[in-house]
Amino acid sequence: LVEYLSNKNSMNDQEIAEHFQMLKSLQTNFAQIHRNHVKIKANSLNILLASHDDTTLEDVVCSAEDGCTLAEFPTTLEAAKFCREYRISIMMGTPNLVRGVSHSGNISARDLASKGLIDILSSDYIPSSLLMGAVKLGLIRKNLALGLQSVTQFPAEAAGLEDRGTIE
């Protein structure tokens, strides 16, 4: 991020330090207020809450306390295991699964798949990867139906859409 800021915005070390301090100040002053507002609003509208990029046990505990039932892209094996313990469904991106590596250096979806730690697959901005990802998950788990359910039934159920996601 330091390199990005210095190159993109021509910021020197002092300006970068001040920028980070300003961001920390904003987080300290507003993060919990905004987080509480989102929880209250989501609960009042019966909207599913999902966490994003949980990394540690602390992240997962905080997500569980907030009422999150879905973890979008846990970044470590530790976080994924704790999501399972806290009964938080785990969603990973199909591009990560198909490539076998995260584009940002996080846990590989294949590693999580091989440990049974993926419930739902998302396109992660590449819709054409969904079918290939579902088949790949089915092959890894030796259960093609499970792979297909990860892009149909399981996301629908996680979103509370009980009237879709399956063909009967």
What residue ranges belong to the model's regions?
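Metal-coordinating catalytic core of metallo-dependent amide/deamination hydrolases
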Residues: 1-54, 65, 124
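Hydrophobic faces of well-ordered beta-strands that scaffold small-molecule active sites
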Residues: 1, 49-51, 70-72, 90-93, ...
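A general structural motif
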Residues: 29-33, 50-53, 71-80, 99-105
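Acidic, glycine-rich loop-and-beta core segments that form the ion-binding/anion-interacting portion
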Residues: 57-71
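His/Asp/Glu-enriched, well-ordered alpha-helical/loop segment
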Residues: 86-96, 100-168
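Active-site beta-loop-alpha junctions enriched in small/polar residues
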Residues: 1, 54-56, 76, 95-97, ...
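Short acidic active-site motifs
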Residues: 58-59, 78-79, 107-108, 166
